[in-house]
Amino acid sequence: MSRLAECTISDTVDELVQRAKLAEQAERYDDMAGACKTMAEMGNELNNEERNLLSVAYKNVLGARRSSWRIMSSIAKKQAGTPLADQTDIYLKKVEEELIPICNDVLALPVLPITEKIGAEAKIFYYKMMGDYYRYLAEVQEGEQNDKSTEAAEEANQKATSLAEAELSVTHPIRLGLALNFSVFYYEIKNMPEKACSLAKAAFDAAITEVDSIKDETYKDSTLIMQLLRDNLTLWNSECETDS
C-alpha cells in the first residue's frame, strides 16, 4: 500500500471528512483511507456518512490489489510447470504482500472491537466489514491461516445477520449488502453453492415483496443490491440445481 496522506489527531472530524471527500473525488483512495483511519482513531462513534467514507476508501484501496491477485492467480495456474512459473509466483507473492497488510490494517481499526455503546446499525455495519475483510484474507491464504480467517469471517457475518434480521427492514441496503456478501462467502470461500443460493434467494424474495415501501433516499442502493443478488442467482443457478 502506498504511503497514506498525513493526517493528525489535531485535525477536526469535519476537516477529515472534507479531506476524505476531496480525495474520493480525485480518486486518491490511499489519501482517503488515511483521513478515514485518523477519524476512526479519534475515539468518537462514526456517524453513517463517516462509516460509508471509511468503507469506500478501503474498498477502493484494496479493490485494485484483489483484481490483480485474481488475474495473477489465474495466470499462475496456467503457467504451472512452465519456465515462467517462478516469475509468476514471485509477482503473485508481491501482490499478496500488499493486500494482506491492508486487510490487517482495517481489522486493527479501533472501531472494530465492537462495544455495546454503539447503535444496532453501526454494529451490523462493523460486523459486516469484519466479515468482508476476513473473507478477503481467506481468498489469498492457505492452510491454517485460511482456516482461521474463514472461521472469523463466518462468525462475523453470522453476528451481523442475526442483528440485521432483528433490527433492519428486509429492504435496508446494509441488510441486503450483508446477504450479498455472505452468500459470496459461501460460494467462493466455503464452496457451498447451495447454501449461497439459499441465502441470496431468501434475501431477494423478502425484499421484492416490500420493494414499494423502500425509502426514496435508499431506493437506488437497495434496488442495485437486489439486482446483484439476482445476477448471482442466475450465475449460480445451474450449480445449485446440480447440488440439490
UniProtKB/Swiss-Prot annotation:
InterPro entries: 14-3-3, 14-3-3_CS, 14-3-3_dom_sf, 14-3-3_domain
Gene3D superfamilies documented for this protein: 14-3-3 domain
Xref: SUPFAM superfamilies: 14-3-3 protein (SSF48445)
UniProt similarity note: Belongs to the 14-3-3 family.
Protein name per its UniProtKB record: 14-3-3 protein homolog 1
